[in-house]
């Protein structure tokens, strides 16, 4: 058996086409979704991510605003800018590109964003609402992962999901989202002693650790859905995931590639959250 490859780029394009239709309908009502992205400094990777977000906004018809600051900006000045955007009716989503310079406390910046405009889903209020199953903006990568699993038409309810990784960005929240879908969830991490025993029980395995090709066929239950969140660059310059793709291909039932797997879904879910925020706000642009 060779696994079915879940092509995240194709799923993302399909969802963006749906979002584009929604944006057209909103604009007919005088509502234009708007996203503000704050970029601090000149980090090439951050700038590349921001370009991807701008391109996504343009693709679906979202108004986007890029606000750039030098690396020397004070925390106070950055907080003042967030306050301004919180009060700007044209802006439905605020995103601060991480990481920030060391002299700026990321926690303070994230918590200053209004929960109504927290399209990244990182604000503690958003996290709390997610934990209790309330309606909120879900964190983009975890939400994208759940959507990819749903593409397999597998009934998540009652399935055993194993998550390798416990970061606040992916590992912890993705487990919670699957729990909200009535799955049984197990977390594995660097202190887990019997990892392979646990992962071989997984109907759905999520790998998000940042270790190239760590997960091999002997971690996988036959027919499992394997979602590879890792993006690692080898010495050859080639990108690879946390899963040894070729090794696992003959055991898994479904698998995401790297690249063109989880990555395209992250920005797509950001666009989704921005459109949802605009719907909730319902502010007609003049």
Swiss-Prot record:
This is Bifunctional protein FolD. CDD domains: NAD_bind_m-THF_DH_Cyclohyd (cd01080). Belongs to the tetrahydrofolate dehydrogenase/cyclohydrolase family. GO terms for cellular component: cytosol. Pfam families: THF_DHG_CYH (PF00763), THF_DHG_CYH_C (PF02882). Gene3D superfamilies: Leucine Dehydrogenase, chain A, domain 1 (3.40.50.10860), NAD(P)-binding Rossmann-like Domain (3.40.50.720). InterPro entries: Aminoacid_DH-like_N_sf, NAD(P)-bd_dom_sf, THF_DH/CycHdrlase, THF_DH/CycHdrlase_cat_dom, THF_DH/CycHdrlase_CS, THF_DH/CycHdrlase_NAD-bd_dom. Catalyzes the oxidation of 5,10-methylenetetrahydrofolate to 5,10-methenyltetrahydrofolate and then the hydrolysis of 5,10-methenyltetrahydrofolate to 10-formyltetrahydrofolate. GO terms for molecular function: methenyltetrahydrofolate cyclohydrolase activity; methylenetetrahydrofolate dehydrogenase (NADP+) activity. Keywords: Amino-acid biosynthesis, Histidine biosynthesis, Hydrolase, Methionine biosynthesis, Multifunctional enzyme, NADP, One-carbon metabolism, Oxidoreductase, Purine biosynthesis. One of its GO terms (biological process) is tetrahydrofolate interconversion. It catalyses: (6R)-5,10-methylene-5,6,7,8-tetrahydrofolate + NADP(+) = (6R)-5,10-methenyltetrahydrofolate + NADPH; (6R)-5,10-methenyltetrahydrofolate + H2O = (6R)-10-formyltetrahydrofolate + H(+). The gene is folD. NADP(+) binds at residues 165-167, 190, 231. It comes from the Bacteria. Its EC number is 1.5.1.5, 3.5.4.9. Pathway: One-carbon metabolism; tetrahydrofolate interconversion. Homodimer. It comes from Bacillus cereus (strain ZK / E33L).
């Amino acid at each position: 058996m060779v696994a079915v490859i879940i092509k995240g780029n194709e799923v993302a394009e399909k969802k963006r086409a749906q979002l584009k239709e929604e944006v057209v309908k909103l604009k007919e009502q005088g509502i234009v979704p708007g996203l503000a992205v704050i970029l601090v400094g000149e980090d090439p990777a951050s700038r590349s991510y921001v370009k991807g977000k701008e391109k996504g906004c343009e693709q679906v018809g979202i108004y986007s605003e890029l606000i750039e600051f030098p690396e020397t900006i004070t925390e106070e000045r950055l907080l003042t800018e967030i306050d301004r955007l919180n009060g700007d009716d044209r802006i439905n989503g605020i995103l601060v590109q991480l990481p920030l310079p060391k002299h700026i406390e990321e926690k303070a910046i994230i918590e200053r964003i209004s929960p109504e405009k927290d399209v990244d889903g990182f604000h503690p209020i958003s996290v709390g609402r997610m934990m209790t199953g309330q309606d909120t903006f879900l964190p983009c990568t975890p939400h994208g992962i759940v959507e990819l699993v749903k593409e397999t038409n597998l009934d998540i309810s009652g399935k055993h999901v194993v998550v390798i990784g416990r970061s606040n960005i992916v590992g912890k929240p993705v487990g919670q989202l699957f729990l909200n879908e009535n799955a049984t969830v197990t977390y594995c991490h660097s202190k887990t002693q019997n990892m392979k025993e646990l992962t071989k029980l997984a109907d759905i395995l999520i790998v998000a650790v940042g270790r190239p090709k760590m997960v091999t066929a002997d971690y996988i239950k036959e027919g499992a859905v394997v979602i590879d969140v890792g993006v690692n660059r080898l010495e050859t310059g080639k990108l690879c995931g946390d899963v040894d793709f070729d090794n696992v291909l003959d055991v898994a039932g479904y698998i995401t590639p790297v690249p063109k797997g989880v990555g395209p879904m992250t920005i797509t879910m950001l666009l989704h959250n921005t459109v949802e925020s605009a719907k909730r706000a319902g502010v007609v642009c003049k």
